[in-house]
């Protein structure tokens, strides 16, 4: 197979996005082909919306996000088969598994439990497990990740190797509202049940979030040991729980409502990691 010319694809997508008001379901030719090829490459994991650099920073391929957005203008609404009880949906994005047989699933190498939903252009790596969950388009789920029941992986989100997203976890998307960078959960993190990480925040490698921790760009993440406050990023190997901080006093009173924050209570040690490590038996 010929290696795709990514520079040419990027150029076409960028130009098309600048002229997006003129793009619709009747658009054919170079623009449609570039968008469709970009989504196929995302679906295969040959490209990804964000890539970690050697210095630890993440580079965002904005043109791939733009390709995903352009696909909504190009594709008409249509019947999407595969609903419960042989019902259907009405949408613009087909299932990743559309037309798959046992051969495709064997080759992909991950487990997809009944009722999980993965949209076309999301990549799922080998040895990942998808419980009844939702993975949105453009997302990247790396090797050995567990996406537990009712967890949601938002558009273009990046989920690292051996990450465990517990039941009901929400990882925010970045298409609406359009954020600068995707939400990222780095390798070997454990995200506790019903927690939410949104707005392009990053949870660095090896961190553990307890149940019900909510992190957005404006959330104060307080290191209890040092008093340092972080925004938008959980440092590596942090153990984080939900907490509160004193708020300003209300006018004329000596009290005020406390405000939510996330608290780093310690750094993940061997005991913590043993409690949150993956179970290889589930991935055989």
Curated annotation (Swiss-Prot):
GO cellular component: cytoplasm
UniProt key word Lipid biosynthesis: no
SUPFAM superfamilies: Trimeric LpxA-like enzymes
Signal peptide residues on this chain, from the entry's feature table: none
Gene Ontology MF term list: 2,3,4,5-tetrahydropyridine-2,6-dicarboxylate N-succinyltransferase activity
Domain of life of the organism encoding this protein: Bacteria
Assembly description: Homotrimer.
Entry's family note: Belongs to the transferase hexapeptide repeat family.
Listed name of the protein: 2,3,4,5-tetrahydropyridine-2,6-dicarboxylate N-succinyltransferase
Organism: Brucella melitensis biotype 2 (strain ATCC 23457)
Gene that encodes the chain: dapD
